C-alpha cells in the first residue's frame, strides 16, 4: 500500500468564524484548481469548527477538517475541554495531538497524549501525533533519543490496525524562521520510520505518513517534497493566508 500525502494547516489561536469562512471562500477554489496529489486539511480553533464545516460542505470541497487537541474522555467534569463526540458533530477527520505548544506551555505528558491518540483512533478520527526536539536536545545530540521516546510512549495506546499520522516539528524551528535543512529532515524522518518499524512492523512503518513542520513556507516546500521520507507538511503561519497556503500546496505538489 502506498503512503498518502497530506498538507495540513494549523491555525492555532487565529481567525474568528467570519474570518475562517472568508478564508475558505478563497482557498477552496484554489484547491480545486491545483488538484494536488496531497490531501489538504485545516485545523482551526474549536470556536470556528461549525463555520468551517458548513463552508466546506457548501462548497463541496475535499478539504479535511481537523482539531488542534481533544480530551481523551467522551464526557465528564473537565472544564474547558472538548470531547471526540463533540468534534464528530462537525465531521472532524483528524486531530493534532502532542503539539510542542501543548507539551511545553500546558505541560501535556506522553502518557496523556497516548490516551488521546488511542481514544481518537477508536473513534474513527485520525490522530496526528506531533513530535519534536528542543534546541537544547539538538545541541546536546539527544534528538534521536527524544523522538524515539515520544514515538514509543505516544503510540502506546494506538490499536494495532488503526491509522495514524506522525508530524515531526523541531521545536527550535516552530515560528522562529529557522528551517531545518532538507538533509537533516530526511535523516530524522528515516530514523522515525525505523523506530515505527520496531514499534509495529516494517510493513506498517512503510505505510505511515510522516509530515514535516517548522517554518514551512512556499519557498521551501518544494525541497521537502524531494525527501523520500517526507510525506507531507504541517504548516503554521503560512497557512493563515489563502494565497500563501495555496502556494505551499502548489510547490509541494510540483
From Swiss-Prot:
Species this protein is from: Chlamydia caviae (strain ATCC VR-813 / DSM 19441 / 03DC25 / GPIC) (Chlamydophila caviae)
Pathway noted in the entry: Carbohydrate biosynthesis; gluconeogenesis; Carbohydrate degradation; glycolysis; D-glyceraldehyde 3-phosphate from glycerone phosphate: step 1/1
Function recorded in the entry: Involved in the gluconeogenesis. Catalyzes stereospecifically the conversion of dihydroxyacetone phosphate (DHAP) to D-glyceraldehyde-3-phosphate (G3P).
Residues reported in the UniProt entry to bind substrate: 10-12, 175, 215, 236-237
Protein name: Triosephosphate isomerase
EC number: 5.3.1.1
UniProt main location, coarse: cytoplasm
Keyword Transmembrane belongs to the record: no
Annotated catalytic residues: 99, 169
GO MF term list: triose-phosphate isomerase activity
Amino acid at each position: 500500500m502506498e503512503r498518502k500525502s497530506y498538507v495540513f494547516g494549523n491555525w492555532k489561536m487565529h481567525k474568528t468564524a467570519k474570518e475562517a469562512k472568508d478564508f475558505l471562500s478563497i482557498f477552496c477554489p484554489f484547491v480545486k484548481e491545483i488538484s494536488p496529489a496531497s490531501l489538504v486539511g485545516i485545523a482551526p480553533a474549536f470556536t470556528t469548527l461549525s463555520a468551517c464545516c458548513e463552508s466546506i460542505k457548501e462548497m463541496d470541497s475535499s478539504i479535511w477538517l481537523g482539531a488542534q487537541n481533544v480530551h481523551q474522555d467522551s464526557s465528564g467534569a473537565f472544564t474547558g475541554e472538548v470531547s471526540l463526540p463533540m468534534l464528530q458533530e462537525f465531521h472532524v477527520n483528524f486531530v493534532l495531538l502532542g503539539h510542542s505548544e501543548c507539551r511545553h506551555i500546558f505541560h501535556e505528558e506522553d502518557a496523556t497524549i497516548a490516551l488521546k491518540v488511542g481514544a481518537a483512533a477508536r473513534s474513527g478520527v485520525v490522530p496526528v501525533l506531533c513530535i519534536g526536539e528542543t534546541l537544547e536536545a539538538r545541541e546536546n545530540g539527544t534528538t534521536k533519543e527524544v523522538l524515539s521516546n515520544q514515538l514509543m510512549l505516544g503510540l502506546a495506546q494506538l490499536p494495532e490496525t488503526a491509522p495514524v499520522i506522525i508530524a515531526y516539528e523541531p521545536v527550535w524551528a516552530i515560528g522562529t524562521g529557522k528551517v531545518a535543512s532538507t538533509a537533516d529532515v530526511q535523516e530524522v524522518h528515516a530514523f522515525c520510520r525505523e523506530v515505527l518499524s520496531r514499534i509495529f512492523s516494517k510493513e506498517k512503518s512503510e505505510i505511515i505518513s510522516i509530515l514535516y513542520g517548522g517554518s514551512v513556507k512556499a519557498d521551501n516546500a518544494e525541497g521537502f517534497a524531494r525527501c523520500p521520507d517526507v510525506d507531507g507538511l504541517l504548516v503554521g503561519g503560512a497557512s493563515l493566508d489563502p494565497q500563501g497556503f495555496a502556494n505551499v500546496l502548489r510547490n509541494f505538489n510540483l
